[in-house]
C-alpha cells in the first residue's frame, strides 16, 4: 500500500455509485491507489432495516451484504482507476468465487473492506476482497465486475394489444 493517502467522503462516493439507502454499503474510502487497491469502511448500525428479521434477538449482518459491500468497494476502485461511466453505461457485479465467511458481523462493528485489482480481460475485471472487523478477517472472496456498453437509443415502438373476443378465449359450447 502507498503512504500517499487518498480518502473519499460520502459525497464523492454518492457521485460514483448509483446505490442509495438502504443499499449503499460504503460509508467512506480510507485509502486507495488507482489500479491497485482500495480500503473502505462500513459502520454497522443496529438501525439497519434488515436486522428486524436477520435475526430477531440475535442480529447478524447478512453475509450476502458483506459481499455486496466488497463489490461496491471494487466499483469505486474501478471508477477511480478507469474513469466515470458514459451515459447509459453500467458497472455491475458479474460473479464471485471462493467466498468464505469466518465470523459474524454484528451491530456496532466497523467493517473494513480491502479490495485489490487482479486483472482485466475481455471486459471483466477480477478483484480479491477481504472484510475485517477489529483486524480479524470476517470474509474473503474473489469478485468479477463488468462495465456495460451504453445502451442503444430506444426506438419509438407502439405496442397494440391483440383484440381477443371472449367467446374465442372461452368458447361457449351449446348443448344440442
UniProtKB/Swiss-Prot annotation:
Function: Involved in unsaturated fatty acids biosynthesis. Catalyzes the dehydration of short chain beta-hydroxyacyl-ACPs and long chain saturated and unsaturated beta-hydroxyacyl-ACPs.
EC number: 4.2.1.59
Single GO BP term: fatty acid biosynthetic process
UniProt keyword Lipid biosynthesis, yes or no: yes
Subcellular location field: Cytoplasm
CC terms in the record's Gene Ontology section: cytoplasm; membrane
Stretches that traverse the bilayer: none
EC top class named in words: lyase
Entry protein name: 3-hydroxyacyl-[acyl-carrier-protein] dehydratase FabZ
Gene Ontology MF term list: (3R)-hydroxyacyl-[acyl-carrier-protein] dehydratase activity
Catalyzed reactions: a (3R)-hydroxyacyl-[ACP] = a (2E)-enoyl-[ACP] + H2O
Gene3D superfamilies: Hotdog Thioesterase
Signal sequence annotation: none
Keywords: Cytoplasm, Lipid A biosynthesis, Lipid biosynthesis, Lipid metabolism, Lyase
Active site (catalytic residues): 54
UniProt xrefs under InterPro entries: FabA_FabZ, FabZ, HotDog_dom_sf
Family membership: Belongs to the thioester dehydratase family. FabZ subfamily.
UniProt keyword annotation of Lyase present: yes
Amino acid at each position: 500500500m502507498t503512504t500517499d493517502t487518498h480518502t473519499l467522503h460520502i459525497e464523492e462516493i454518492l457521485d460514483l455509485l448509483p446505490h442509495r439507502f438502504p443499499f449503499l454499503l460504503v460509508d467512506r474510502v480510507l485509502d486507495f491507489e488507482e489500479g491497485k487497491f482500495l480500503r473502505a469502511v462500513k459502520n454497522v448500525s443496529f438501525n439497519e432495516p434488515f436486522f428486524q428479521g436477520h435475526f430477531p434477538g440475535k442480529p447478524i449482518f447478512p453475509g450476502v451484504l458483506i459481499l455486496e459491500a466488497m463489490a461496491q468497494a471494487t466499483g469505486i476502485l474501478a471508477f477511480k482507476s478507469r474513469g466515470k461511466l458514459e451515459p447509459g453505461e453500467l458497472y455491475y457485479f458479474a460473479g464471485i468465487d471462493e467466498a468464505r465467511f469466518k465470523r459474524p458481523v454484528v451491530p456496532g462493528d466497523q467493517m473494513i473492506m480491502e479490495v485489490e485489482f487482479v486483472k482485466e480481460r475481455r471486459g471483466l475485471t477480477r478483484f480479491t476482497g477481504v472484510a475485517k472487523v477489529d483486524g480479524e478477517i470476517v470474509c474473503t472472496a474473489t469478485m468479477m465486475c463488468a462495465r456495460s456498453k451504453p445502451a442503444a437509443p430506444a426506438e419509438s415502438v407502439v405496442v397494440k394489444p391483440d383484440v381477443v373476443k371472449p367467446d374465442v378465449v372461452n368458447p361457449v359450447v351449446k348443448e344440442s
